[in-house]
């Protein structure tokens, strides 16, 4: 089984890294360089428009892009650099050496700048969006740019791990791939986390979903789970698997 997570918008470079956590280089260096070149050619106003962010964030990320290619630009393994709720609950800094190695072989993280990342891949601080339409040398929307590179790569990696993909990423990340091809080539199972409402319905609450995704990922990795069915036995943040509300492609967990 392979697990797919989304990147986080927030990044922080730790001052110290646990010595037992080995590091690797990102896979799609050539493509990343093209996106970084396109982004670094943008001024603050252009970044604000392309990324749909306020001026303060645009100024911060303009500085990041201007220093992106410098050798002393800070870096950290992707799983430790991303600071969103998913990664807080994943808590990769607590992994032992064997957990870390296993995670680097069974977890991929989507990224609008780096394409697909292993947890151990060293990254720099950045902000990018899939909907951004970049100039030269990309000349395309980021989603479209990545699709030809990532689709076959993901299918191959899932097949190497037994042909099962646990999709714990956000829906928009499917646009980085030809998702119909992915679903035809491998088995995709999406865990859904919902909360009961006063009217009797069920609703997905973003913060709870992110927490559950991080905990579920940590569980699957540290327990060395090989098949998607094994996640049914785990109850992250009080979410209980409901087989009567699930099907072969969607596993529904409801908060008790």
UniProtKB/Swiss-Prot annotation:
InterPro entries: YaaA. Signal peptide: none annotated. GO terms for biological process: response to hydroperoxide. One of its GO terms (cellular component) is cytosol. Belongs to the UPF0246 family. This is UPF0246 protein PG_1544. It comes from Porphyromonas gingivalis (strain ATCC BAA-308 / W83).
